[in-house]
Amino acid sequence: MRILKSHPLLKIVNSYIIDSPQPANLSYLWNFGSLLALCLGIQIVTGVTLAMHYTPSVSEAFNSVEHIMRDVNNGWLVRYLHSNTASAFFFLVYLHIGRGLYYGSYKTPRTLTWAIGTVILIVMMATAFLGYVLPYGQMSLWGATVITNLMSAIPWIGQDIVEFIWGGFSVNNATLNRFFALHFLLPFVLAALALMHLIAMHDTVGSGNPLGISANYDRLPFAPYFIFKDLITIFIFFIVLSIFVFFMPNALGDSENYVMANPMQTPPAIVPEWYLLPFYAILRSIPNKLLGVIAMFAAILALMVMPITDLSKLRGVQFRPLSKVVFYIFVANFLILMQIGAKHVETPFIEFGQISTIIYFAYFFVIVPVVSLIENTLVELGTKKNF
């Protein structure tokens, strides 16, 4: 017997990435898992390297980043890889979630996998926010001040929580130290969650497929077929990432963060990184501070209710015309929210933001269940007519 199948550790690896039987009809939309694992690997390696040269201090943080850029061998490359792979990570995660919503990956028996995936998204957002504060430019300082201040919306204990997070009465050395410690820790938590995500998927029925039906009658081993298929998208990913890192490394960043943090001067507009903009737009679209914070967190957790609100008898929207139209409206609405999150709080962006927020929540709690019931009824009527 081969050592791969007899060794206690290697046989686990073998069962997951070598002999694992995958549906033969998987499209390239099922390649995001390997790309996201690659992104996480790049982030951990570049992050640990950056941590060796970074100083989490109000007076030295900005200078230590400049030191990495100017004095450390290939420090500029490590930093730009880290910042641009973060954007790639979120871009691929949103595509991964979109594919899951389109093909009904949240339905039984993959509900646990979907729930763990939602937790991964929340941890990713927390990690990204903590990391954005560390260079300690203008946007870092004011972004940290604005986002941590959201906790003050909690009745009675809000302000105490904010000061507990800061470790003082404003963003200071203690804040940077704890943000750095947590930013260093959370990627390893992410890796553990990703492993749980994989185990939850493999220990139920494995990957879904574009048809949304059982693929037990036609499967192929993961190696060499799907490893080669994954390698194709990995090479494309490296080409695109290299274009950003070498030719436009700051295209997805904010120029304000190249100005050293100054608590006495507020930047013209305080906006987070592009991948957090839709949720920032939802936060700003509700005038009440507490309700805005609740809505922002609810917007992420809304993904958790999809297994409950989708009442369709079919998995996915690929064979459901009404749901397909509604899904594409939801995607367009999400992109509109992303644009509005970057705009100033003024007319007409306030009104557009409020309309888009209503559409966003309506999709999960109203539109999906209503449309799926209509489609179920039409299918049943059609079936009775044929028989």
Swiss-Prot record:
InterPro entries: Cyt_b/b6_C, Cyt_b/b6_C_sf, Cyt_b/b6_N, Cytb/b6-like_sf, Cytochrome_b, Cytochrome_b_C_euk/bac, Cytochrome_b_N_euk/bac, Di-haem_cyt_TM. The chain crosses the membrane at residues 32-52, 76-98, 113-133, 179-199, 226-246, 290-310, 322-342, 349-369. Its cofactor is heme b. PROSITE patterns: CYTB_CTER, CYTB_NTER. It is found in: Mitochondrion inner membrane. It is a multi-pass membrane protein. Heme b b562 binds at residues 82, 183. Its main location: mitochondrion. GO terms for molecular function: metal ion binding; ubiquinol-cytochrome-c reductase activity. GO terms for cellular component: mitochondrial inner membrane; respiratory chain complex III. Heme b b566 binds at residues 96, 197. Signal peptide: none annotated. It comes from the Eukaryota. Binds 2 heme b groups non-covalently. Keywords: Electron transport, Heme, Iron, Membrane, Metal-binding, Mitochondrion, Mitochondrion inner membrane, Respiratory chain, Transmembrane, Transmembrane helix, Transport, Ubiquinone. Fungal cytochrome b-c1 complex contains 10 subunits; 3 respiratory subunits, 2 core proteins and 5 low-molecular weight proteins. Cytochrome b-c1 complex is a homodimer. Heme 1 (or BL or b562) is low-potential and absorbs at about 562 nm, and heme 2 (or BH or b566) is high-potential and absorbs at about 566 nm. Component of the ubiquinol-cytochrome c reductase complex (complex III or cytochrome b-c1 complex) that is part of the mitochondrial respiratory chain. The b-c1 complex mediates electron transfer from ubiquinol to cytochrome c. Contributes to the generation of a proton gradient across the mitochondrial membrane that is then used for ATP synthesis. Belongs to the cytochrome b family. This is Cytochrome b. It comes from Emericella nidulans.
